[in-house]
């Protein structure tokens, strides 16, 4: 970059201002990254808990299903599953976590399986349907939590790349520019000082010469 800038005092001031801005920007991005990392690890715990809950309710639901099939006819089980088939709606909003847009999902209260169960369906089959409704809710929680986790993870990577670009490329480049400009300005100052000293020395020699000549003329007149 040094070859693309004019080594002037105004350029030096501009480079110093750019260095201050870049350094401040890197600090802000690092604070954001640290906050996101803290949020990420908190979400990891939530995601693991959601997965564990899903595994637990799934196991219970399949146990209920096997029991229902043992006590009720396959037709009864199938009829309840068809009766409970409908669109599953969730209340989803978008929230911002340190500038990252993530979904916030609220699961509405669902209708009990007994409310839409056909006639001649046993309690075990109704319980199985209820348990699988709980599984569906657990799946939604897992999806929401892992979506947050993925988006925050992507933002951490993006922020880290920006920090690295500032610290490894931009800031060193600006510092190189400042060193270059200072070097040129210092060299110019030394050259100017040397030139002024030569002029001063020349003027002093001429003055001494004039004084010497004046002294000679005075002696001759006497």
Swiss-Prot record:
Domain of life of the organism encoding this protein: Bacteria
Q: Which GO terms describe its molecular function?
A: ATP binding; proton-transporting ATP synthase activity, rotational mechanism; proton-transporting ATPase activity, rotational mechanism
What family does the entry list? Belongs to the V-ATPase D subunit family.
Q: What is this protein called?
A: V-type ATP synthase subunit D
Q: Which residues form the signal peptide?
A: none
Q: One Pfam family, please name it.
A: ATP-synt_D
Could you state one GO biological process linked to this protein? proton motive force-driven plasma membrane ATP synthesis
* Provenance organism: Deinococcus geothermalis (strain DSM 11300 / CIP 105573 / AG-3a)
**Record's function text:** Produces ATP from ADP in the presence of a proton gradient across the membrane.
Q: Which UniProt keywords apply?
A: ATP synthesis, Hydrogen ion transport, Ion transport, Transport
For this UniProt entry, which segments traverse the membrane?
A: none
